[in-house]
Curated annotation (Swiss-Prot):
SMART domains for the chain: SWAP
Domain of life: Eukaryota
GO CC list: catalytic step 2 spliceosome; nucleus; U2 snRNP; U2-type prespliceosome
Task performed by this protein: Involved in pre-mRNA splicing. May be involved in endoplasmic reticulum-associated protein degradation (ERAD) and required for growth at low and high temperatures.
Record's protein name: Pre-mRNA-splicing factor sap114
SURP motif repeat residue intervals: 44-86, 147-189
Sorted UniProt keywords: Chaperone, mRNA processing, mRNA splicing, Nucleus, Repeat, Spliceosome
Keyword Nucleus included in the entry's annotation: yes
Quaternary structure note: Belongs to the 40S cdc5-associated complex (or cwf complex), a spliceosome sub-complex reminiscent of a late-stage spliceosome composed of the U2, U5 and U6 snRNAs and at least brr2, cdc5, cwf2/prp3, cwf3/syf1, cwf4/syf3, cwf5/ecm2, spp42/cwf6, cwf7/spf27, cwf8, cwf9, cwf10, cwf11, cwf12, prp45/cwf13, cwf14, cwf15, cwf16, cwf17, cwf18, cwf19, cwf20, cwf21, cwf22, cwf23, cwf24, cwf25, cwf26, cyp7/cwf27, cwf28, cwf29/ist3, lea1, msl1, prp5/cwf1, prp10, prp12/sap130, prp17, prp22, sap61, sap62, sap114, sap145, slu7, smb1, smd1, smd3, smf1, smg1 and syf2.
Localization of this protein: Nucleus
Naturally occurring in which organism (per UniProt): Schizosaccharomyces pombe (strain 972 / ATCC 24843)
Gene name per UniProt: sap114
SUPFAM superfamilies recorded: Surp module (SWAP domain)
Family matches, as InterPro entries: SF3A1, SF3A1_dom, Surp, SWAP/Surp_sf
Amino acid sequence: MSSLMEFQDRNTTNNETEHQKSITDQSSSVPAGVILPPPAIREIIDKSASYVARNGPAFEEKIRQNEQANTKFAFLHANDPYHPYYQHKLTEAREGKLKSHATGLSTQKTSTLARPIQKPIEATIPAPSPYLFSEPLPSISSLDLDVLRLTARYAAVRGSSFLVSLSQKEWNNTQFDFLKPNNALYPYFMRIVQQYTSLIREPISSPEQELRENVRDPYSLLSKIQPRVRWQSHMESQKKKQKEEAEKEKLEYAQIDWNDFVVVEVIQFTKSDEHAKLAKPTNLADLQTATLEQKSAMFTMPDQNYTIEEAPPTAEPWEPISAPKKQEFGVSLPPSLASPEKGGISSTTSVSPAAQASPVLSTTTQPKVQKPVPKAFQPKVPMEISPFSGELVPATELEEHMRLKLLDPRWQEQRKVEESRKSTLNLENVNVAANMKRLVSQRTDLFDVQNGVEISQEEIERRKRAATQSAWGATPTNKRR
């Protein structure tokens, strides 16, 4: 910090010295008895003198008319004390001796101040020529590598048409995923194809000649090795700088005071989360050594611990519909055309016009559609009273109901808060069960008071008949009399 202040003080002192030198030079060039104006007015006078010297007296008269109210151009009048200085500069401008000291000073000042800000430009090191037949091997299994190289060899021999047809044919085959442009192995595969193509289709003799020259004169390799070594050291230094910057960023991230943050919500893991059926964790080494088919199976096939339940079929197996047989209705078949099993007995068949118009389909081809069962014929589900809320719960759902009620109340509150944030309505259904229970107790004509089950239609009709008979006072014995 102190060095920076000393540098700024040094620049300020140098600028003041240069400014004083420029003033001294200008004052020495001005004849005796001429008043030297201040720097701001002096710059205007110098510019005006240069323009008037180029454009003539008409331009001076135009400035005098346009700037009558401007005091900065008062030097154009003969009674102004700075008018002699203007005449002196006008004479120098006409003779070509006028110099812009202010412009030179500002330019020099700007360059002086901008000099320490400039960063040193690093020397660019040209990249060496790449190796022709050397390619870093990606993480791939030996089986996939053999398939890739064999495919690249055939593609180099037969051309791009073979590659296009093969990629279309094996598009769904995971063993040939390296043919897809979005696969990570596709660039490596294309470089291998280029290497095989350069060897098979375009044989060149320059590599052999170069190798022979290297054997004859080993010291000639130094001129090729040195640029590559410089490039390698340069790349290592760049990687080191990037690593240091990453370490600095991690250090700054670690210095964050995490206690300043506010906890919005806490997620708690229960025992059910610990015993949940999740996929087995994969290892990096297993992923690198696995083949393309195994990788595809890892992400697509379900785990063996899972059991997949299938619903029973709702229809019989489908069979193709056979064409209806041609029959002659109302005509007796001759004995020669009769089947041998029937012994030549003729048979006549008569069909109604309606049946003749519509072909008869096999019953096996029509799926069985399950019709909805009326509530009156549905089996009655036994109900149980919940010990927590007192509401009626089906006996088959009582276990799940108890599990939900025994959950941590804090988790339930957090879940309610989350659902209230996601919901677009502010309606609550807290007393729905109580309202339904009160409705059941009041509507005895629709629900049974004892178990809360809906009364069947037969029971309703029976009650209506009983109420009608009691209203008229009619009994079976009275009707007989």
